[in-house]
Structure formats: C-alpha cells, structure tokens
Amino acid sequence: MKRYMEILAFCMLFMAFFLSGCSLSPTNTGVLIGTNLALSGKGMSYSTSTERGIELAKDMVNDRGGLLGRPVQIVSVDNHGKPEDAEAAIQQLTVRHVSAIIGPDLTDCTRVVLPNVEAVKIPLISPACTQPDITVDPKSHEVYRYIFRAAYIDASQGRAMADYALKQLHVKRAAVFYYPDKTYAQGLAEYFRSAFAASGSEVPVYIPVEEVQDLTKYLSLLQRENVDVIYLPGYDDWTIPAITLLRSHGISQPLLGPDGWNGPKMERDVDISYLTQVYYTDHYAGHDASEAARRFSQAYYEKYGEWPDSYAALGYDAFMMTAEAIERCQSAEAPDVARELEKTIDYDGATGTISLDANHDAIKDVFIMTFKDGQPELAATIPFDGQTQ
C-alpha cells in the first residue's frame, strides 16, 4: 500500500507539472511556505485566524531580512474545509516547490493528506490538530516522517484538566457527558476519566449524550451520585447549549471543557451569570502569559486592530518553528527542513515554550482558562506531565 501511494503521489505531481509548465527547481527570488487552510466553507473562522497569525509571522521575519538572505513568500491555497480539496492543495503546493506546508488545521482534512505528504517528502505542520493519529499511523504505530504539529495532543489536555480539577478545585467525584459521534470528544472523555480515576477519585457518571436536551434525564443522577464537577468535552456548538441547560436547571458545580470551547461564541452566546466556575484547556493564554506572547499579541493588534485568538497564535508558532528550522539547517529544501524540525527544542512561542518529541508532537504546558466578567482569563498553567501518546 505504501508503494502504491508513493506511485500515485508521483503521478499526481507529474501531471500537475506537465499541465502548469512550472519548474520544480527552488525559486531564486524567495523562500516559499505553503498554506493549506479553509479560507471559505467549513472551518473558515478558525483558518482565517490561523492565516492571520501566519501572515504576521511572515512579515516579522521579512522585516528582519527574510530567510537565507531571501524574502519569504506565502503560497496560500483554500481547501474550503473539504478533504478532497485539501488533497488537491497538496498537489498545487508540491508543484510550487514549497519548503514546508502549514495546515490543514481541520482534522478530517489533515488525515486525508498524510499519505501524499509522506510521498512527496514536504514537511507539514498542523497548527491546531490535537488527535493522536495525525503524527502516528494508528495501524502500524510508525511516526509519519514529514508530519508535525504546533498544538499539544488531546491526551495532554485531558490529563491536565483532570490534574487541575483534583489539585486546585479539590473535587472527588466527576461526571462526564460527551457527544458520541465525535472522535475528538470520545478521546478526551476517556483521557480525562483515566487520569481522574488513576488518583483514586471516581467517575460514577460517564454517559454519551447526542441531543443536549437529553441532559435533563440525568439531573437527578448527578444529585444521587453526589457529583462535584462535570466534564463536557466537545466543540462549542454542542457545549454552549449544554452549559446553558445545566446552569438554567440549577447545576452549580464547576463545568470543565477542552480547547474546543475557545473563541468568541462562549462570551457572546452564554449568559455571563452562567460562566462562573467554568474552566477549559487552551493553547494561548493571552498577552500576559509570557514576553513572547506579549510581543505576538501587540504586533497582531497593531496589524489587525484586534486581539488574537488561539488559532492565530498557533498559526504564528507553526510558521516561526518552520522559519527557525530553515535558519538552523541553512537550507530551504523540504527534506532538510523536515530533518531540522525534528530537532526543535525550547522554541519560545506565543503559545508557550515548545519542543517536539519522538512522535513530532508538541511538548508544552497546558493553560487552564476561566472567565472573569465574561472574558477569558488565565486560571492556571499545568506543566507538561512527561507522558506522550
């Protein structure tokens, strides 16, 4: 199968080259970095922020002289949030002889391009994908040689939230409700439960809930089981109505969630009185987290007139990690850049200090966010626990 995918990718590359009439030799005018993002369609709000972070990073690198004495140029391809278009984007970017590709940042779009990226040997950094099978083949358990990420993995954020609940909220009995048809939510639910139970605490309520309204069936169960914290892994389209329903029915226990809660919808769509004792994991803690975060945040505000979100920060870090790798190896050739990315240690970024482990996953701290006067605020920083996938 691997040999077949290599042949298929080569044929795609040859066809694109023949049709475009482009040269495959590196450009003499600039270092090209490709982006494969959903600039329209599904995921556009996430990817637009990611692209802004990338553009800011590119401008900052060019302001200090570019890379290898050459300006950096972004080759942007819109994948429309569709897996088939994400595949086509890899073909287009390969023909342009980019040194690296940033994105996709949607999991389904990223999964589908993995074989082609491995075949054409161009490093791909996913800014925001957190599921484990992005960097490691789930069947062979082999690490993809050319796939990297700037975000921490779901195992890290699930364990970090359990750690925060146990040690700082001092809770003992947790309930977990999760959306059953999302790999993201199911994985996080299990990571949290395992870490919470490993301490000797209990998770007496662990229930998949597809329709938010069905949560009303379990309100009395929460009381009977004396639950003192509730974990709701999922994206904001499911968790916002879940938070609203639970709070409106008098559930006052702390509500916990993952990075899928970040973004303006929480502040906009949830009554401010319901956000008390609400906590979620995130990659970016705002401009107060570190000096690197402050520099990024201020530069972003000066360029765009608004403060950045986590996706912008992750896009920025993905670009800067790539730029540092190019400078270290003094080459813009894609295989050289991939080899150097593997050596990333203590990159000082907007989302924290990042090193890459043997699986090409980001070793970094996890931020626990809460709300004050309806606005996100850093509650705690949970150091990396030393565990990988």
Regions found by a protein language model. Give the residues of each.
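Beta-alpha junction/loop-to-helix N-cap segments that form part of ligand/metal-binding clefts
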Residues: 23-29, 45-52, 64-136, 208-215, ...
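Segments of small-molecule ligand-sensing domains
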Residues: 302-312, 323-377
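Periplasmic-binding protein-like
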Residues: 93-105, 123-127, 175-178, 226-236, ...
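Hydrophobic alpha-helical segments within soluble ligand-binding/sensing domains
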Residues: 86, 149-175, 186, 214-216, ...
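An alpha-beta-alpha
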Residues: 75, 142-208, 229, 322
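Extracellular/periplasmic bilobed ligand-binding domains
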Residues: 115-120, 185-281
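Extracellular/periplasmic periplasmic-binding protein-like sensory domains
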Residues: 144, 243-316, 375-388
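Extracytoplasmic "Venus flytrap"
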Residues: 30, 34-55, 77-83, 105-106, ...
